[in-house]
Amino acid sequence: MVKDGFDGLSMHKLAKAATISPATIYIYFKSREDLILQISITEELKMFDATLEGFDPEMSFDEGLRHQWKNRARYFLKNPKRMHFMEQIRYSRFHGEVLKRANSEFVDKMMQFVHNAIERGELIKLPMEVYWSVAFAPLYQLVKFHINGKGINGKAFQLDETAIDQAVSIVIKGLKPDK
């Protein structure tokens, strides 16, 4: 799916790649859509678990966001194909259903973390989509540069602790209320 996208996925192609009969796939999945949804839910839950490892919604905003960045970066750098797959899902008709069925504590913990940070005066109040875009898009772009092995200028790029710390510090500064 990562290589050919959803349109390029057929049960026959998948069966051939797995060296099994297409009928075998239908024992486990009702349809192509069911296969995509089940794999997507599994992958989403793995990413949620990786992000939440050692995370507590009671952490300070600074500590909690840094922790999430490091967990997410570690997961995506270890699993670049999964990251690409999840990006495909995020912009597909399957995403809403995946989130609904994943039914994870992830969203609740993220919402609690943001609410706590706002209550403590550590984070400006923003619509969740604006917060999420500012808080995590820079990390995802850095990970993509790393996976591609090149930065925006075409020169070699490798994501390291220093780059993560620089970027997350700027993000935190931008999301804190003026004092």
Kindly give the residue locations of the regions a language model identified:
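Helix-turn-helix
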Residues: 2-34, 38
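Short coil/turn segments at alpha/beta junctions that flank glycine-rich nucleotide-binding fingerprints
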Residues: 3-7, 58, 79, 120
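Short, structured helix-loop boundary elements
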Residues: 11, 33, 37, 62, ...
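Generic detection of well-ordered alpha-helical segments
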Residues: 33, 37, 41, 45, ...
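Hydrophobic alpha-helical connector segments
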Residues: 38, 52-78, 131-135
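Amphipathic alpha-helical packing segments from all-alpha helical-bundle domains
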Residues: 45-52, 78, 94-120, 129-134, ...
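C-terminal peripheral helix-coil segments that are non-catalytic and often amphipathic
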Residues: 74, 108, 112-120, 137, ...
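Amphipathic alpha-helical segments used for helix-helix packing
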Residues: 76-95, 144-150
